[in-house]
Curated annotation (Swiss-Prot):
Listed InterPro entries: Poxvirus_Rif-R
Other information: Displays structure similarities to capsid proteins.
Disulfide cross-links: none
Family: Belongs to the poxviridae protein D13 family.
Subunit comment: Homotrimer. Self-assembles to form a layer. Interacts with A17 (via N-terminus); this interaction is necessary for D13 association with membranes.
Predominant localisation class: membrane
GO biological process assignments: response to antibiotic
Membrane topology: Peripheral membrane protein
One GO CC annotation: membrane
Organism: Fowlpox virus (strain NVSL) (FPV)
Localization of this protein: Membrane
Name of the protein this chain belongs to: Scaffold protein
Amino acid sequence: MNNSIISSVINSIDSSSKRTNIFSFDVQQPTAYMPQYISVNGYHNKKDNDANQVCSVSFDIRDQHIAAINYFFISIQLPEVSGEGKFAYVPYVGYKCIQHVAITCGDITIWETDGEELFDKCVDDKIASLSGYSPELNDISTGYTPNDTIKDPTTLYVYIKSPFDADKTISSLKLVNNKITVTITFRSINDVIVYDSKFQVERFVKDFVYSTELHLIAYAVSDIKPKSAYIELDRRVVSCSSTPTPIPVISDVYACTAMSVYVKPYYGMMENKFISYPGYKQTESDYVRCMVNRLLDDLVVVADTVPKGFPSTATFVKVPVDGQINLQDVDIIVKIDNVPDDKDIYYHTNLLIFGTRKNSFVYNISKKFSSIIGMYSPNTDSINFSKVNHTISITDASIPVSFWVSQKNVYQGDNRSNYSKSKDLVVNDPFRKGIDMVNKTDVISRLEVRFGNDPIYSEISPITKVFNMLLTGSSINMRKIIFNMNPANIFRPTTLNANTKRGKDKLTVRISYIDTDPNNPIHYVAKQLVVICTDLYRIDYDGNINITKITE
């Protein structure tokens, strides 16, 4: 740059103005402290021996040399799994086996969270993979004899993200000579596993015991001088699954920093069995590919006569030499090479069908294939498929087996072979959202939020979902309205404040679900609307730890 320009800029500066040095700064002397990695053994609070009941483990933290704590995580020991059958843990099994977390001081609850909300806040962190996201745990493994090892023992590490981690030492929880108790409530292990009919799940669940340890960072501080701080706690309201248009109401909303809305599927008994499951990799294409591979074994069969081992309601057509068949209004091409002269190719015309009325539209999976090309192997009596064109979708892969044979279906819906049915898998995942396996289908067509009687927000496009991803970096398909964007621990969080005189102390959410075809089984997945209100609290340290809900 020209020297004359530089000189003119420097000489024009008013030397009498007070300015901050941006090329160096005075280093301040911090409070003297020493961080420590602490591990704490817990004790079980379970009152009975029923393996299907929840189990609580508590950890007490009290030490005269510890002044503050944060960064909690737990380690969970998973035992060796042995026996016959197919078995896997769902991804992030460490988080998904947690039902509730609470940090208390005597009778005072300092902070608590539901397991699903904890998972949603942590799943995008790299450390979440340590909670049980790996091919070794999530891929389906098979045992062929009672002594076979299906899964090796391993240890999970689950980070319990809390408000006390927001700004390291500043946001830490100060003990002020109090005993702090961290209580983890676990689900039954049956709620987070995948297995087939051969696996002895009752024995596995009965023998399983949660073996866990709490780990945290503790600070030995010379003179801590704790000051009041603000923390946020989530409140969760779940609507009834039988309500077609739920209108959940959250009362006592005095200072709200955020509100979230999402939809969960509700599966009744025997509705959690599925035809296919991809395992570790669970993208949309993985689910679809796995579903197609399962269907093809029954869809195209090479045999010397009409295929056996199928229900009496199953129908087949013999594929002609040119490979072209017509299934009602759909043309399908089937080309299988190397078929012996004494055998024919058969196409299953009603593999999976669903309809609510006779002689009307029928949802037929067999009609979703347009061309199938492969080669038959006489040695293995199987077909190696090289190219398959189809319109199988993620919703098809997300239909529970029981829906095909439900009373709503006027047809015998599941006409697969007995061998194929024996491969079906029970998939228990308590944190599933939406009506399909990857939460792709946005089932909310309209959202309206009222504060008291006044509407404060309305949308027909998922704008709040996009802003949630933009502002929080979350990959969860969830709609969220955020009222606070202030830096943590520097300013009081901005809130939606109540006006009790005008009746503004409750949030009402009205939603409309999208229209789905009643002839598609996915239409009958029961839905639960979940609304989360994030309330603002103040934590005070005056010899004890006190938590106060902000009401102004």
